[in-house]
Amino acid sequence: MKNLYLIFFILILIFCTGFSDSVIDVSVSYQPAVERLEQIFKSYMPVKQGIIYTKVPRGLIISIDENEFFSTGDARLKESSLYVLDTISFIVERLKNDCVIESHTRQEIPQDSDYKEFWEISTARAQNIADYMVLCRKVPFEKVFPMGFGELMPFKNNVSTSPKGFD
């Protein structure tokens, strides 16, 4: 059975609001900015089935299927994934937003893999994406934050082991 592994690019919007402003005011002013981010990414990103956009209080999450970036049990980026990363880097580089790269996986790890634990491979994958964005695409390092969670903190409530489930 094949599990999905999602890479999350979370663009955190920082708003300058006074301490006297209510939470409702912040969320109301926040929503148009997230809508705009989503429009920007959708206009530049290639149209693919494995890309899901989700608006959350902390920003826009762009979830991308693991097969876009990695082979099973491996943390090296596939050459075919570089176009998607180049596009994301191009946009992130021009925005004021930070980019958090969250890696989650419950995919079976082959015995001959360099990684034995889910957290090890997910951390290495997030770091490799960040390294590519910073070293190859020149995104400022202070804007990119890689995080590996292994099997912990799955993104979707419908986590399952079926091919259509999300981790």
Q: Where do the model's predicted regions map?
A:
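N-terminal targeting leaders that direct proteins to extracytoplasmic destinations
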Residues: 1-58
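Short, aliphatic-rich beta-strand segments
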Residues: 60-66
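Periplasmic OmpA-like peptidoglycan-binding domain that tethers envelope proteins to the cell wall
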Residues: 31, 56, 72-79, 92-94, ...
